[in-house]
Amino acid sequence: KHLAELDFLQAQINPHFIYNTLSSIRFLLEMDKVQEAGEMVFYFSKLLRQTLSRSVEFIPLGEELDTLKCYVELQHLRYPDTFDYSCEVDEALRDNTLPKLLLQPVVENSIFHGVGRHKIHIRLRGWLEGDTLILRVEDDGVGISKDKIDQVMNKDLQINRVGLKNVQERIRLNYGPGYGLT
């Protein structure tokens, strides 16, 4: 049962990500931004190769960061001058493994819910605490209320969206209830 539930949650991420990216490309084409749409197709095809070509659940952090970089470039094309992104993860950590597509939904949340009137700064940091890999995504965007976070994370909600709830479930299924998003 545990493996079937994990497979179900992992399978949800790819369609969510694909639909959002195709919507972004469509948006650029509607705005007659053909060159930017072409660049998005380039990054999108690279992402598809990285995320769909390997049928493994865990990947090295380095691959996850490379995939995330492509995603960030896609969003920079769609939302120019709305956010900056920095990644502070020691090269020595790149071989640590984690469930694939764990970081992209978190950064996506920062972009789509953090952008307001001002340019935001999204920062990914990674380090080891003992033998635990800690990855922190921070932004200085408009923020989200505790009630909204609780609503998104509520297990009783129907799974009609993926994203943070999906990431939380996959972390807990893989590592136990003491781990997850905070």
Spans of features found by a protein language model:
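Two-component histidine phosphotransfer core
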Residues: 1-182
